[in-house]
From Swiss-Prot:
Localization terms from the record: Cell inner membrane
Organism the protein comes from: Brucella anthropi (strain ATCC 49188 / DSM 6882 / CCUG 24695 / JCM 21032 / LMG 3331 / NBRC 15819 / NCTC 12168 / Alc 37) (Ochrobactrum anthropi)
PROSITE patterns: NA_DICARBOXYL_SYMP_1, NA_DICARBOXYL_SYMP_2
Protein name: C4-dicarboxylate transport protein
Membrane-traversing stretches: 21-41, 57-77, 92-112, 161-181, 201-221, 234-254, 320-340, 345-365, 368-388
Amino acid sequence: MIAVPTGAAAAPRGPIPFYKHLYVQVLVAIAAGILLGHFYPELGTQLKPLGDAFIKLVKMIIAPVIFLTVATGIAGMTDMKKVGRVAGKAMIYFLTFSTLALIIGLIVANVVQPGAGMHIDPASLDPKAVANYAAKAHEQTITGFLSNIIPTTIVGAFADGDILQVLFFSVLFGIALALVGDKGKPVTDFLHVLTAPVFKLVSILMKAAPIGAFGAMAFTIGKYGIGSIANLALLIGTFYLTALLFVLVVLGAVARYNGFSILALIRYIKEELLLVLGTSSSEAALPALMDKMEKAGCKRSVVGLVIPTGYSFNLDGTNIYMTLAALFIAQATDIPLSLSDQILLLLVAMLSSKGAAGITGAGFITLAATLSVVPAVPVAGMALILGIDRFMSECRALTNLVGNAVATIVVARWENELDTDKLAAAMNGTPVVTDLVPQLEPAE
């Protein structure tokens, strides 16, 4: 845990004005971005660099945060079997709920049939519109994905900001530190000291979140327009409702069984959720989410393994989107899918979805990878949803974030690495001291 200053500097402050809370600032920025993008679309599209710059700032610090959290967490473990046990339980959880999300997407698409009645001729679709996504999808093979987890060089993993490569090295380095015993203690102590300024840097960067959210939202509305979603509103509405029900019912049941409320958890991570809403990237909230989960009572070793891994293997929102969108395309182009076709789609999606990263557009590329293997559904049909994918990206990212927060608490509980008193305090709204949440350190 990060050391908290004591003495006069840590004296309790008075009530913080509501406008100094990060979630209020991000919410206002999102609203302002929507208005500017709607009334001044040309100006809105020119603000894209603001959102891109903020995402790059956060990505800059993700690799050090993961390395420090994972390496110090594992180095503190005396039982190396525990590392494998935590990873194994996390993967079982990921596989179970990712598959469930895919199945729910299939069921909802068959019941609601959002694409029925559109009667689109597949031959009339422009394959060039999705050619770039399809090309990237073909590059994303299972073998290539697995081999890419191993970095060519340590420096390359950090320079590229590849989450899985950094995680892979961090786990090995943490195990090595634990195995050398007292000889590794100076290195471990140094990493613990280094954690404080790195996490303080994240706190500083998070203060720019409203600017990033404003620019990203202004660009989205300015480029695509609110009216562009009207024709495909049923698909968007179906997806949002399905994701909401998945969070409240499925994840809600998991949360209740494990001793906490899903609504309380959502309230606890509201700043991170609003940040994701503004940027369409769950990756933007990764450092702050890791800190929040640790402050909520989950041991650092569990947080460091579960959350970064979950960003590639536990994407519930992306999974719902994939099967729902695939069946929408089939329905819109009047292509009937038999039960065997849908089972094949499910099996392929189970594999292809495991390589999706928490960045904007990754879900669309993963969908292209899935459809390229399923012959019944034309990849060119993705042109139907290309214009609205950005509006669905927010929901995917939000659902993914909540899913990984739930997974972290559940795995920590399974491993008896959960401080239930801290969890109860966090869920009840008791202030939790953290270096990463700006509302506890208001701007001057």
